[in-house]
Amino acid sequence: MQYSIQKFLNEGAYKLQHIGINNPKLEARILLQHAINKPYEYLLANPEKQLNQLEIEAVEKVLERRLKHEPIAYILGTKEFYSREFIVNKHVLIPRNDTEILIDVVLQYHSQHSLCHSSNGGNPDKKQLDSVVKPRNNIKSSNILELGTGSGCISISLLLELPNSQITATDISIDAIEVAKSNAIKHDVTDRLQIIHSNWFENIGKQKFDLIVSNPPYISINEKPEMAIETINYEPSIALFAEEDGLLSYKIIAENAKKFLKQNGKIILEIGYKQADQVSQIFLDHGYVIDNIHQDLQSHNRVIEISLIQLNRSYARRIGKSLSGIQQNLLDNELPKYLFSKEKLIGKNYNSCKIKSNYTKFNLEKSKESVSRGAERIKIREHLRTYKEDVANFSSSTSIFLEIGFGMGEHFINQAKMNPDKLFIGVEVYLNGVANVLKLAEEQNITNFLLFPNNLDFILHDLPNNSLDRIYILFPDPWIKNRQKKKRILNKERLTILQTKLKNKGSLIFTSDIENYFEEVVELIKQNGNFQITNEDNYSKPHDNYIITKIPPKSY
């Protein structure tokens, strides 16, 4: 039988299309390249080149495997992940593009964590922002645990992006561990990667980690009929499916992670796109705080970010009191009433406060019930109801200003000081900033504000419509990389929601020192059609009552 390159490409693509392969021409070309070990340019330059007998046999073999729906990654023996090639076989899950979001979230966390401890008080300048997208040699070392490493693509990608970090990776499959070890050698990270045969946390010992990451099994067995044939028939079930509607993995992690996390440790997990609420509830029930839920490029919920926050000496130094003094204030309910949610400051559970025997119960703000140490935690949504009552208690004539991401709080607290007749609401995920606002407010006797120490999306839908006179978004995270731009604080959907929260003739003030980001926001606002830009003639002109902070203003 005679086969030219072009003839195989045509016939191979036809056969692949007949069984429902989505990109038959592309896959036929990739299979041919692999079988005859030639680059794409060679195929283009020699379409009439006749294949020899050995090449024909190799081509027919790989095509037959693909026609049986074997994943092309297993046929090739490799899969690209985060711009790097990884060895894969039937013993490991094939890396997905969606999982790259988990890497992005970890890297962003590291960058922000490094910047918020910088010498300029936590406000990154342009030079620092540029460093976020460059090699991260300046970021402090972290000790990371990955549960269920499979091919090792997550751990190895993180090690290559974070050269000062160490990772312990576990897997229950010895065959998968061999693949991960091969990839560690391939990418030269064996000196910083410890791979352990372990069922979840069993063989880790007494180590504690700054960060726990995982892409655990999360598919319900009930979803199996809806899945692709190649996934069901070839990829390892142990890496795909979990009992209890796909939630068992998260329950195991929630129940055990506290023993292996350092103080203020973080958990970052991939989740099924329909599981955000259920997974959040599992971790809330175990005394964690949900920091953020990140979406993939299809706008599906894909990665959840979870904190284990407990009372610590860093926070004590911030507000100028001893650790025991803060505990006493919590017990006596003396922490300022304007703190919207105590959950972040109380810690992983009530026992972490080391309550003395004569303090068996204490009250949470706005709660008439005493909460015993063993009682279930008050959830974020319950705090939101309290928050809405607080806002409702203010006169309808009171102006309410919202600042999203107030950083270290210089602008926020100064605005509250200058406008004592107005209510200021602050949203900020980083406790250093929250603690600094409390310190400044205590020093200056400022009380006309409420704080929400969590992600904006947890409060946004609960804000009453037509309730805000002004919204400040000042120098938000620019998410510089192209693939990260979907994470920017302002997008079409969120801008529409914010517009409904503003009163008629209310104002939105946005500032940035990243020029292209600022231009994109201006275009977004124009497309919305419900805003009138009042300083279009001079964007560099400061807005009314502008307060200079530690970020040098370059554009407004």
Curated annotation (Swiss-Prot):
<feature type="binding site">
    <location>
        <position position="477"/>
    </location>
    <ligand>
        <name>S-adenosyl-L-methionine</name>
    </ligand>
</feature>
<feature type="region of interest" description="tRNA MTase">
    <location>
        <begin position="313"/>
        <end position="556"/>
    </location>
</feature>
<protein>
    <recommendedName>
        <fullName>Bifunctional methyltransferase</fullName>
        <ecNumber>2.1.1.297</ecNumber>
        <ecNumber>2.1.1.33</ecNumber>
    </recommendedName>
</protein>
<dbReference type="Pfam" id="PF05175">
    <property type="entry name" value="MTS"/>
</dbReference>
<dbReference type="InterPro" id="IPR022438">
    <property type="entry name" value="RPE5"/>
</dbReference>
<comment type="function">
    <text>Methylates the class 1 translation termination release factors RF1/PrfA and RF2/PrfB on the glutamine residue of the universally conserved GGQ motif.</text>
</comment>
<feature type="binding site">
    <location>
        <begin position="148"/>
        <end position="152"/>
    </location>
    <ligand>
        <name>S-adenosyl-L-methionine</name>
    </ligand>
</feature>
<feature type="active site">
    <location>
        <position position="477"/>
    </location>
</feature>
<feature type="binding site">
    <location>
        <position position="481"/>
    </location>
    <ligand>
        <name>substrate</name>
    </ligand>
</feature>
<dbReference type="InterPro" id="IPR040758">
    <property type="entry name" value="PrmC_N"/>
</dbReference>
<feature type="binding site">
    <location>
        <position position="428"/>
    </location>
    <ligand>
        <name>S-adenosyl-L-methionine</name>
    </ligand>
</feature>
<dbReference type="InterPro" id="IPR003358">
    <property type="entry name" value="tRNA_(Gua-N-7)_MeTrfase_Trmb"/>
</dbReference>
<dbReference type="GO" id="GO:0008176">
    <property type="term" value="F:tRNA (guanine(46)-N7)-methyltransferase activity"/>
</dbReference>
<feature type="binding site">
    <location>
        <position position="455"/>
    </location>
    <ligand>
        <name>S-adenosyl-L-methionine</name>
    </ligand>
</feature>
<dbReference type="InterPro" id="IPR055361">
    <property type="entry name" value="tRNA_methyltr_TrmB_bact"/>
</dbReference>
<feature type="binding site">
    <location>
        <begin position="215"/>
        <end position="218"/>
    </location>
    <ligand>
        <name>substrate</name>
    </ligand>
</feature>
<dbReference type="InterPro" id="IPR019874">
    <property type="entry name" value="RF_methyltr_PrmC"/>
</dbReference>
<dbReference type="Pfam" id="PF02390">
    <property type="entry name" value="Methyltransf_4"/>
</dbReference>
<dbReference type="GO" id="GO:0102559">
    <property type="term" value="F:protein-(glutamine-N5) methyltransferase activity"/>
</dbReference>
<feature type="binding site">
    <location>
        <position position="171"/>
    </location>
    <ligand>
        <name>S-adenosyl-L-methionine</name>
    </ligand>
</feature>
<feature type="binding site">
    <location>
        <position position="200"/>
    </location>
    <ligand>
        <name>S-adenosyl-L-methionine</name>
    </ligand>
</feature>
<dbReference type="InterPro" id="IPR002052">
    <property type="entry name" value="DNA_methylase_N6_adenine_CS"/>
</dbReference>
<keyword id="KW-0808">Transferase</keyword>
<comment type="similarity">
    <text>In the C-terminal section; belongs to the class I-like SAM-binding methyltransferase superfamily. TrmB family.</text>
</comment>
<dbReference type="GO" id="GO:0036009">
    <property type="term" value="F:protein-glutamine N-methyltransferase activity"/>
</dbReference>
<feature type="binding site">
    <location>
        <position position="215"/>
    </location>
    <ligand>
        <name>S-adenosyl-L-methionine</name>
    </ligand>
</feature>
<dbReference type="InterPro" id="IPR007848">
    <property type="entry name" value="Small_mtfrase_dom"/>
</dbReference>
<keyword id="KW-0489">Methyltransferase</keyword>
<comment type="similarity">
    <text>In the N-terminal section; belongs to the protein N5-glutamine methyltransferase family. PrmC subfamily.</text>
</comment>
<dbReference type="InterPro" id="IPR004556">
    <property type="entry name" value="HemK-like"/>
</dbReference>
<feature type="binding site">
    <location>
        <position position="403"/>
    </location>
    <ligand>
        <name>S-adenosyl-L-methionine</name>
    </ligand>
</feature>
<dbReference type="InterPro" id="IPR050320">
    <property type="entry name" value="N5-glutamine_MTase"/>
</dbReference>
<feature type="binding site">
    <location>
        <position position="513"/>
    </location>
    <ligand>
        <name>substrate</name>
    </ligand>
</feature>
<keyword id="KW-0819">tRNA processing</keyword>
<comment type="function">
    <text>Catalyzes the formation of N(7)-methylguanine at position 46 (m7G46) in tRNA.</text>
</comment>
<feature type="region of interest" description="RF MTase">
    <location>
        <begin position="1"/>
        <end position="310"/>
    </location>
</feature>
<dbReference type="GO" id="GO:0003676">
    <property type="term" value="F:nucleic acid binding"/>
</dbReference>
<dbReference type="Pfam" id="PF17827">
    <property type="entry name" value="PrmC_N"/>
</dbReference>
<dbReference type="InterPro" id="IPR029063">
    <property type="entry name" value="SAM-dependent_MTases_sf"/>
</dbReference>
<feature type="region of interest" description="Insert">
    <location>
        <begin position="348"/>
        <end position="399"/>
    </location>
</feature>
<keyword id="KW-0949">S-adenosyl-L-methionine</keyword>
